[in-house]
A protein has these predicted regions:
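Extended, charged alpha-helical "arm/stalk" segments used for dimerization and assembly
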Residues: 92-200
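Gly/Lys-enriched N-terminal cap/neck module of very large, oligomeric protein machines
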Residues: 76-100
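Extreme N-terminal "head/tail" segments of very large remodeling/mechanoenzyme assemblies
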Residues: 1-84
Length: 204
């Protein structure tokens, strides 16, 4: 579970009172709010984006964490990773460097790629599958089902974690998460890819 979400940004609303079980994040209007004032900018979407940022998302040029107002500040998350309490920290100005602390060990620096690989093994056993010669779904593809982004259209259809998610990726991810033989979905996608290539060759 997530114990705390924090930042060196002075105005950041630290979430340090999360409890085991279901936690609901709400934005509450004040007594003086009018019917035209919404709950936007209360931090609900930023909470989701921060989790993705701290679990190794790409953080491209359009990322909120790379804006001039936020790039120099560090964001962090204290959470349980398997049976170890773990703290991860990252900033937009140095997005390729991720700092991880698992007490009593000292803080260590990882690349974003290595961090994603580590999370993939710890949460889903992906590295072990790759070592055995398989090509499992990616960590980002699987993790996005648990932390859904509204901006990606993740709530449009339950079987997809993003509007643009391909059929093969969706099928393989879901079969993996349900404990089914996900390699069947991978083989289906290989057939679709071959059929697409043949169709393109016919049209030449």
């Amino acid at each position: 579970m997530i114990h705390n979400l924090f930042s060196t940004l002075p105005t950041f609303k630290n979430l340090g009172d999360l409890k085991p079980g279901l936690n609901v994040l709400l934005a509450q209007k004040t007594e003086g709010s009018t019917s035209k004032q919404t709950r936007n900018r209360a931090g609900k979407t930023s909470f989701i984006e921060a989790i993705h940022f701290l679990t190794g998302s790409e953080a491209g040029p359009d990322s909120i964490f790379r804006t001039p107002e936020l790039a120099e500040y560090t964001f962090g998350m204290d959470f349980d990773l398997k049976d170890a309490r773990t703290v991860v920290e990252r900033s937009g100005s140095a997005k390729a460097k991720i700092y991880v602390t698992t007490p009593p060990a000292a803080k260590r620096k990882l690349s974003a790629t290595d961090w994603v690989t580590f999370l993939g093994e710890e949460m889903f056993g992906l590295s072990s599958l790759e070592a055995a010669g398989s090509k499992p779904p990616s960590f980002r593809s699987l993790f996005a089902y648990f932390v859904r982004r509204q901006m990606s259209g993740a709530f449009t259809t339950p079987e997809k974690q993003a509007t643009m998610q391909g059929t093969g990726d969706m099928q393989m991810a879901l079969m993996f998460l349900f404990g089914l033989d996900w390699q069947i979905a991978r083989d289906w996608q290989a057939v679709r890819d071959r059929e697409k290539t043949l169709e393109e060759l016919r049209q030449r």
